[in-house]
Each structure stands twice: as C-alpha cells, then as structure tokens.
Amino acid sequence: QLGKSVRDDGEFFVSLLRTFDRDLHWNYVAANKDPEVVKKLLLNPGLIPGFNDSGAHVTNMAFFDGNLRALRLAMDDSEELVAHMTKRLTSEPAEFFGLPPVGVGVGQSADFLLVDPQELACYEGESTIRYEYRDLFGCHQLVNRSEGLVAGVFKRGQEIWNGSGFTDLSGREKLGGALRALPS
C-alpha cells in the first residue's frame, strides 16, 4: 500500500514519515565520498585541514573522524605520506593559527595520541556509525566510534584516555586551557 499513490520522491519520503514516524532511520554519505579527491585536497598546500566532527550533533548526524580518515588514506600510500599527513594535521594548522611551535624533548609538556596502526589499516569511518541512547543528553543519538583505533590520549604527558575509556585524571585535574584570541 505504501507508495502506490505517490507522485514524486518528496511525497514518498513524507509517506514514509507518516507510516513509520520515529522508527524510520537512514544514513548516507554527505560529502568526501571519493578518497582520491579527499587525499588531493588534504595534501593541497593552499588548504589547511579543518575541524572534524565525530558525532557532536544530537540525534541526526554522525560524521567520520576526518583526521583518522586522513591518516588512513596516507597509510594506503606510504610511511612517508603518513609522516607528512601527521604534519598537515598538527604543526601546519598550529603555525597557521599562530600557536607556538612544539617539539618533543626532555622536560617539555607533550600532548599526543597513540594510534594502533593495525586498527588504522582496517578503519572504515562509515561502518562505525551507531544509534544509541546517551544518558548525558537524555536521548538517542547517532555516534561514530572508532573503538580500538586510538590506544591512548595524553595531555601534558598525562594519560586521559586509555583506549577503552577516560582515566581518573580526566575532568579532575586541569591539564590545558582555552586558546587566546589574537589581536586583529
């Protein structure tokens, strides 16, 4: 019966909503569908990789993690490209935004994450989307989780994520701060 009197795609969609109401769920790739085009853009020196959203939108959107996907695309190419992509995702944006250069050295405070290369080799961002209830928001939400891929996150050298959850340090001790606006 559904769709027998439908005249166009819009009317069909409305009839689906009328029939299934809140039980109707779907997903689609909205952008960045072609990996070669994405890689070309990520490597363009005139562009800076930007903000990536992994599911902050309540209920209706769950984007893949663009930074992990960028590393995955680079991994398909070579170790040298992984190193270059890491620079594109970290020090190049920092330089563009006027953040002080940071290196790794004795006595320096380090922010870093550990990515499991075997998990990265298998990573497909679109396949990790789930619809789950979030107590924090009191509703269901689309989320994109890359479990097992990030083995640890460290802020000022202190582990705040251990690969399966936040550590006791997270949210208890101040480890960072907001960036200051630069005068225009």
Give each language-model segment a name.
Residues 1-78:
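Active-site neighborhoods of metal-dependent hydrolases
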Residues 13-16, 82-90:
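Short, well-structured alpha-helical segments that form the helix of a local strand-helix-strand
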Residues 18, 46, 72-79, 90-94, ...:
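Hydrophobic alpha-helix feature that most strongly marks membrane-spanning transmembrane helices
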Residues 27-31, 81-84, 94-127:
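Acidic, glycine-enriched loop/beta-strand segments at the rims
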Residues 39-47, 112-165, 169-173:
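C-terminal cap of metal-dependent C-N hydrolases
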Residues 60, 64, 68-77, 88, ...:
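Feature captures the catalytic cores and cofactor-binding loops of soluble hydro-lyases/lyases
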Residues 66-70, 171, 178:
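Cofactor-binding beta-sheet edge motifs in enzyme active sites
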Residues 177-184:
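Short, solvent-exposed cationic patches
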